[in-house]
Amino acid sequence: MLQALKESKDFLQLTLAQPQHFDETFTFMLGSHTQVEVWDTGVIVFEPKVARGKDIVLSCAVHGNETAPIELCNGLIKSLLEERLIAEQRVLFLFGNPPAIINGTRFIDENLNRLFNGAHSVGEGLVNPERIRAKKLEFYVDKFFSSSKDNSHKIHYDLHTAIRGSKHEKFAIYPYRPGRKYSGEQIMFLEACGIDTVLFHHEPTTTFSYFSSLNYQADAFTIELGKVLPMGQNDMTRFIALNEMLSRLIGNKSLELPDFNAKTVNLYQVCRAINKGFDDFEFTFANDVENFTSFPKGYILAKEGGENIKVEHEVEAIVFPNAKVPVGQRTVLCLKPASTENIDG
């Protein structure tokens, strides 16, 4: 495996050749400047000889059919392996669900991004590949962050693409973080990446980004980069700014970020999540309605169990509507304009 990776510089290819697990870990040097550690299938770490104070996790393929982030991350890994990009920050790359990548599906048995923060072991326990993988991914993130310096700046960008179109093509979800202000610098970094819309979540979740935010106080985000497309059909020119900014971050180059300015970004507060209570749950709007479509107060968003579910605020926008989830899971997030008072500018 080591020789194959050294020759191809293609970590995704190596991962998909053995999607379940690697039988052995291996380590090698890039020149005299970076140690590369492969911990498992889809798990590779770059440890610079002299790190500059940031510990960066870049995860993708938590949903296997969300291909643009996979291509983006594999390109960054290849640049590092070819030494066109030299890491001056510690960085961990994760391909979340390799079997689902091969399958071209969101998941095999269960939505991996509902299984973090210990959810993998609740109820039935470790009964399917996604639950087992979620526990392993938590372990790898813990291993990475726990081996850093105490005062390091921990960052986790969990990269996705969305099922449906969106009025804001690229957007980020900032996990719930009570008692901690949101980072204006991080919001401006995202804006420089071409991600000009941020949602502030209102409650704990079982997502990968919330896991890192809660347990390691990382600046963590779930980042949506447009619409799901098959592998090889993504227009990667749409991610030039993101690729450039991530390369600068990894290489410890100047980010040249302006001060926080709310006028340059779209900020939303999640005001509620609507969970499915009955099998007959259905939305009243068309299946092709875009993310961030707004509805006025009193509008009937959905019906279930003989009851109407209505818009509660003057205006609410919606994201991630999905009526086909199992009973008990989230069908949609409702949003209102966000205040800037809890942002550290």
Curated annotation (Swiss-Prot):
What NCBIfam families does UniProt report for this protein, alphabetically? arg_catab_astE, PRK05324.1
| CDD domains reported in the protein's UniProt record | M14_ASTE (cd03855)
Binding annotation for Zn(2+)? 63, 66, 160
Similarity field = Belongs to the AspA/AstE family. Succinylglutamate desuccinylase subfamily.
Cofactor(s) required, per the database record: Zn(2+)
Main function: Transforms N(2)-succinylglutamate into succinate and glutamate.
Give the record's cofactor note, including how many are bound.
Binds 1 zinc ion per subunit.
Catalytic activity annotation = N-succinyl-L-glutamate + H2O = L-glutamate + succinate
Pathway(s) annotated for this protein in UniProt:
Amino-acid degradation; L-arginine degradation via AST pathway; L-glutamate and succinate from L-arginine: step 5/5
What gene, per UniProt, encodes this protein?
A: astE
Q: What class of enzyme is it?
A: hydrolase
Question: What would you give as a GO molecular function for this chain, any one?
Answer: zinc ion binding
- What keywords are annotated for this sequence in UniProt? Arginine metabolism, Hydrolase, Metal-binding, Zinc
Q: Which domain of life is it from?
A: Bacteria
Biological processes per GO annotation: arginine catabolic process to glutamate; arginine catabolic process to succinate
Q: What Enzyme Commission number does this protein have? A: 3.5.1.96
Residues at the active site:
224
**Which Pfam families does its entry note?**
AstE_AspA_cat, AstE_AspA_hybrid
Listed name of the protein = Succinylglutamate desuccinylase
- InterPro entries for this protein: AspA/AstE_fam (IPR050178), AstE_AspA_cat (IPR055438), Aste_AspA_hybrid_dom (IPR007036), SuccinylGlu_desuccinylase (IPR016681)
